Amino acid sequence: VTAETDVLVVGGGPVGLLLGALLARAGVDVQVWERRSSVPRGSRAIGIHPPSLDAFAAIGADAPVLAEATRVREGVARSRGRTLGTLSFARASATHPYVVTLDQHRTEAILRERLEAAAPDALRPGVALTGLLRRGSTVEATGTGPGGEPVSVRAAFVVGADGARSTVRDLLGIRTTGRDYPDLYVMGDFADPEPGGLTGTALVDVGPAGVVESFPLPGGRRRYVALSGPDRSLGAPAWRPEEAPDQEAARALAAAVRDRTGADADPETCTMLSGFQVRRREAERMGVGRVVLIGDAAHEISPIGGQGMNLGWLDAAELAPLLAGAVRRGEAGPWPGFARRRTTAARRAARQAEANMALGRPLGSLAHRGREAFLRTALALPTSDLLARVYAMRWS
């Protein structure tokens, strides 16, 4: 027997969980299919920007996130041991004058709890989508359950929040365009070696050997992200949340951090390590009829700048009331205004991420001095408040 629901969300990661909770709070009957049976582990994406915290407030997730997260109130740019300038988030948002960091598995756990509170049976772990059939005013989705059994549901709308390798997008036949970048980065979480006064400060060192960014984390930890450089000397350690980090790779990252910034990160304290290459992808359409794509399924951008997950949350926050209204009124999509606004936001975020990458690439001596002068000027101008709003995603 095929079950029925108002909205099927495919993908129970951070974006799908928020959308499911928003819909449930609006009185919409929702199912969230997540192919993974187990709860994901690891810190992964850590940055949560002010507009996302505002969206979390609608489901009561802001308070528990803030109770666990670390508030980042400023960013400091450095080079060759000297401070180039400071970017304060004090006026970046009226509600949350900071960016916060929290391990992704904890953010997901909080969102999962809020979905469970609003719709106890909505999340279906271990269910993988295999087919979509659009029939007039409904979409029939088929899949396999945790034991391989067939599963099906008939929904008024289906939302693909299933990531960069979206099954929903593939089933719709929607192609992506984009490019791969040569930049290779390695990130790792260590016991924070920075002075105690920097526990609320993000640090960006744009020295001649390549950028090192770092962000404070709860529990006295700090995330370091380093450009591997033209020789890719830091390698590309694989993401293995179930295993201890590779010690040789952890030592290589710690050595790069020490050489470029002077901070003495202890490789023995490394709890997460992963390499990643940057790519940008955009779906040619954000959906077909009653099927909509959001998050990485619709637009994948560079992780540098920490905007990708937040973009998906803001997609969800804008889509939820559209879906709730359409369900109540018996209307159908698509919503070209939604697609246009979210595509514009994704392109802006992608350009910003590309600018961030460009500022962190190795340069010759003369060009590097020019970059330092540019950053000193940009961070000293009265317009630095506008720059802070840009980095805090107030435009999104």
Regions found by a protein language model. Give the residues of each.
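Conserved mid-domain beta->alpha element of the FAD-binding
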Residues: 12-21, 25, 33, 111, ...
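C-terminal helical "tail/cap" subdomain of flavin- and related membrane-associated enzymes
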Residues: 321-396
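A conserved short coil-to-beta-strand element within the FAD-binding core of flavoproteins
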Residues: 125-139
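Glycine-rich FAD pyrophosphate-binding loop
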Residues: 24-44
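Active-site-adjacent segment of FAD-dependent monooxygenases/related oxidoreductases
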Residues: 44, 48-114
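Conserved FAD/dinucleotide-binding core of flavoprotein oxidoreductases
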Residues: 85-99, 103-106, 148-149, 197-200, ...
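Short hydrophobic core segments
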Residues: 10, 153-163
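Core beta-strand elements of the Rossmann-like FAD/NAD(P) dinucleotide-binding domain
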Residues: 3-5, 148-157
